[in-house]
């Protein structure tokens, strides 16, 4: 069973000046508030509720095609004939014509369990995204969008 969701709009932000080293009075790095935006990425991710394993996919957007690519990753992880259950929200992408057409090519392979409307907090991955935001994304500065993508994968694959 997987808990799945998207985290869109993760900003790649670069500093415009050098950070100041900590002083004896203040043990933290000082950083100018000015920054340069390098773009955004969307994280499509699931957590295996039995093992805790994260399955990430980082893209520029989160379209039906991106969701299908994510489902293909899950499909490759299990032998043919196994049923893959996915807990997810009611985002329109999850029930689009493209997704339905993809699912029709492998009947019974995926079972979607939708959270109630306004009940996203019931999906376990929401807590994981909150922890990731606090531990890794808060205050992050990168030199490129690709560096942000690499750091997201490194965080999730540890």
Located regions from the model:
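Acidic, metal-coordinating catalytic cores used for nucleic-acid/nucleotide bond scission
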Residues: 62-63, 86-97, 116-122
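RNase H-like polynucleotidyl transferase catalytic core
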Residues: 29-35, 104-124, 140-142
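Hydrophobic "anchor" residues on beta-strands that sit immediately upstream
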Residues: 1, 85-86
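Extended, low-complexity cationic-aromatic segments
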Residues: 1-65, 72
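Short, basic/hydrophobic alpha-helical segments
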Residues: 65-84
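Short small-residue beta-strand/loop micro-motif enriched in glycine and branched aliphatics
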Residues: 52-57, 112, 137-139
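Active-site proximal helix-loop segment of RNase H-like, two-metal nucleases, encompassing DDE(D)
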Residues: 125-147, 151-154, 158
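Mobile genetic element proteins and their domesticated derivatives, centered on retroelements
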Residues: 3-5, 46, 52, 71, ...
């Amino acid at each position: 069973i997987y808990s799945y969701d998207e985290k869109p709009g993760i900003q790649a932000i670069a500093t415009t000046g050098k950070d100041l080293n900590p002083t004896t009075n203040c043990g933290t790095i000082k950083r100018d508030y000015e920054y340069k935006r390098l773009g955004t990425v969307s994280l499509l991710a699931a957590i295996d509720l039995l093992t805790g394993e994260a399955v990430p996919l980082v893209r520029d957007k989160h379209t039906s095609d991106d969701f299908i690519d994510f489902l293909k990753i899950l499909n490759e992880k299990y032998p043919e004939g196994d049923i893959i259950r996915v807990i997810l929200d009611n985002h329109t992408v999850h029930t689009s014509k493209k997704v339905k057409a993809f699912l029709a090519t492998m009947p019974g392979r995926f079972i979607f369990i939708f959270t109630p409307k306004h009940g996203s907090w019931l999906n376990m991955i929401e807590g994981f995204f909150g922890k990731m935001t606090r531990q890794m994304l808060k205050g992050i500065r990168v030199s490129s969008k690709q560096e942000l993508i690499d750091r997201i994968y490194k965080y999730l694959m540890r």
